[in-house]
Amino acid sequence: DILAAFRVTPQPGVPPEEAGXAVAAESSTGTWXTVWTDGLTSLDRYKGRCYKIEPIAGEENQYIAYVAYPLDLFEEGSVTNMFTSIVGNVFGFKALXALRLEDLRIPVAYVKTFQGPXHGIQVERDKLNKYGRPLLGCTIKPKLGLSAKNYGRAVYECLRGGLDFTKDDENVNSQPFMRWRDRFLFCAEAIYKAQAETGEIKGHYLSATAGTCEEMMKRAIFARELGVPIVMHDYLTGGFTANTSLAHYCRDNGLLLHIHRAMHAVIDRQKNHGXXFRVLXKALRMSGGDHIHSGTVVGKLEGERDITLGFVDLLRDDFIEKDRSRGIYFTQDWVSLPGVLPVASGGIHVXHMPALTEIFGDDSVLQFGGGTLGHPWGNRPGAVANRVALEACVQARNEGRDLASEGNEIIREATKWSPELAAACEVWKEIKFEFQAMDTL
């Protein structure tokens, strides 16, 4: 069975058992009346069952309802159908004040019907020939308004300075100030120039996100013809059907697929209603994507440490044990489904590098937009500063030093032989984003 954990807030006067049973029925075979066609099938075989309800400590009138769905209710290899069934209708239910899908357990039999990420972590490292450290990226800013040629120039400067990737912002598709084909051509030129000068493989996440699936595939095909290593998709705004199609194309044609989670906070930000991001992340691993943004713990966007590391493990690892302290409600076995690299992005800069390296480990992408392009000397020195900071942190960690306690000292030592890093530290030493996370356990 597919198992689901719902956070249920019943309306006043509705017992939790009734609310849990209503969720199970409405998201499987139930309707509001008994119908004569019920007799033409075996409802016992197909109905969802609410098998456990537990109150949430410290919350009034909130419960975790566990529901089991028979596997035959779902089309093979379709995240779209899985979500339509489990969360399609039930969230507007009048008997509930609020409802949140906290976690899903996907059984091995269903996992095996999905291709999953286009390539996965090990294949990506082999393609890029980069091992033993996190990868570095940068979102090109300003996100809107640059011409294609100026955009390509910014890409070149960042890659030349030492970054592995640059990125289209999720808003950049094909607007009047910069059509997609022009952007693809200038970015490809920047990639090849930077590769020739550095001897390293470089990439730029060219966004294939478009208004129709046909247009999306046209952009992905053009990217492949240019010979670039990676494309990008906004998987929630683009939709799971489009995303799965693109992931299949990427595997067949040797393209890596970077996934942006634009719109996720509309769904996952509220603590008592919606769907937790760990559910969206599991769905993405099934639908397909080699990278996905997962919060930073230390930057400007939402993300508490334990919760973030919980879904980072769900993205990367083959087998994840149940661990309620990190928000993981079920043990999940991904069998041979490739892993996804978590991307830390949003309000981070060189002073965060030790913490990021310690929190996320080697299998991650650390993405600095303003933290590269905001360098007082320009884009290339900004990229140099980030690469020097990363190499210093990785070397210190490999020598057995503790990044959590010695991080500032490690960066300070590196500034002695990198004026670019010294300038970056001077600019960002006062920048902090000190707000409480909304989505806590």
Swiss-Prot record:
Record-listed Mg(2+) binding positions: 167, 169-170
Gene Ontology, cellular component aspect: chloroplast
UniProt modified residues of type N6-carboxylysine: 167
Annotated catalytic residues: 141 (proton acceptor), 260 (proton acceptor)
Binding note for cofactor: Binds 1 Mg(2+) ion per subunit.
Site residues by UniProt (Transition state stabilizer): 300
Record-linked PROSITE patterns: RUBISCO_LARGE
Localisation per UniProt entry: Plastid, Chloroplast
E.C. numbers: 4.1.1.39
SUPFAM superfamilies for the chain: RuBisCo, C-terminal domain, RuBisCO, large subunit, small (N-terminal) domain
Catalytic reaction equation(s): 2 (2R)-3-phosphoglycerate + 2 H(+) = D-ribulose 1,5-bisphosphate + CO2 + H2O; D-ribulose 1,5-bisphosphate + O2 = 2-phosphoglycolate + (2R)-3-phosphoglycerate + 2 H(+)
Modifications after synthesis and translation: The disulfide bond which can form in the large chain dimeric partners within the hexadecamer appears to be associated with oxidative stress and protein turnover.
Binding site for substrate: 89, 139, 143, 261, 293, 345
Reported cofactor(s): Mg(2+)
Gene3D superfamilies tied to this protein: Ribulose bisphosphate carboxylase, large subunit, C-terminal domain, RuBisCO large subunit, N-terminal domain
Extra information: The basic functional RuBisCO is composed of a large chain homodimer in a 'head-to-tail' conformation. In form I RuBisCO this homodimer is arranged in a barrel-like tetramer with the small subunits forming a tetrameric 'cap' on each end of the 'barrel'.
Function description: RuBisCO catalyzes two reactions: the carboxylation of D-ribulose 1,5-bisphosphate, the primary event in carbon dioxide fixation, as well as the oxidative fragmentation of the pentose substrate in the photorespiration process. Both reactions occur simultaneously and in competition at the same active site.
Known partners and oligomeric status: Heterohexadecamer of 8 large chains and 8 small chains; disulfide-linked. The disulfide link is formed within the large subunit homodimers.
Official protein name in the record: Ribulose bisphosphate carboxylase large chain
Organism: Coriandrum sativum (Coriander)
Lineage: Eukaryota, Viridiplantae, Streptophyta, Embryophyta, Tracheophyta
Gene: rbcL
